[in-house]
Amino acid sequence: RHDRAMKVVVIDDDPTGSQTVHGCPLLLRWDVETLRRALRHPSPLLFLLADTRSLAPAAAAERNRDIAGNLAGALGAEALQRADVLLVSRGDSTLRGHGVLEPDTLQDAFGPFDATFHVPAFLEGGRTTVNGVHLLHGQPVHTTPFAKDRLFGFSSSDLAAWLQEKSRGAIRRADVQRISGRELDAAGGAGLPRLMDRLRALRGNVPVVVDAERQQQLCAFGAAVRA
């Protein structure tokens, strides 16, 4: 038996993500039968610990393809549609990891998607996004030691520029849309239908960066996505 509400399936690149949730299945393997059982769980949330941050790019992409293929098989076996699932590719809130490769792989293997939302945020740890710029305790994250990571270093805190850098130009900075903090504040009240209309108009896997300064903004964004 299924709860036919949308299931949020989180593909987690590192064990730290699952430490912030409770009351949902946490899978360490993703064969079709295991996924079928997890889809029947009443929780609206399902975590898969893919641990891809520790892998080379080719191996990380292959693991995402494997998960996407098995998830599609499990959905079919349970008479569910891909539209019944909201995929979250959970990465590092200081922009380390395969933050462009993994969503792109999921688009190819599980899409097509109307949009990919990039929402780096860990508010309790001082990691916010304001005016499209990712900050650590108010400091642009590209000026912190995280940006000098040996494997995942980067040169810009502006998320549109970061997407262009990490995609090696496949995503153009000018093509990246942004959902502003002001829109999200409005969506926390009477402005929610306006944000929902904007999201419904997205097509062609457009990249969208999302401001995140307060928990209420993230809640409003989540409500609009799931509406």
Where are these regions (language model features)?
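Short loop/turn segments at strand-loop or loop-helix junctions that form parts
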Residues: 48-53
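Cap/lid and interdomain-hinge subdomains that line or gate substrate/regulatory clefts
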Residues: 6-12, 19-22, 35-37, 44, ...
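Alpha-helical scaffolding within the catalytic cores
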Residues: 28-35
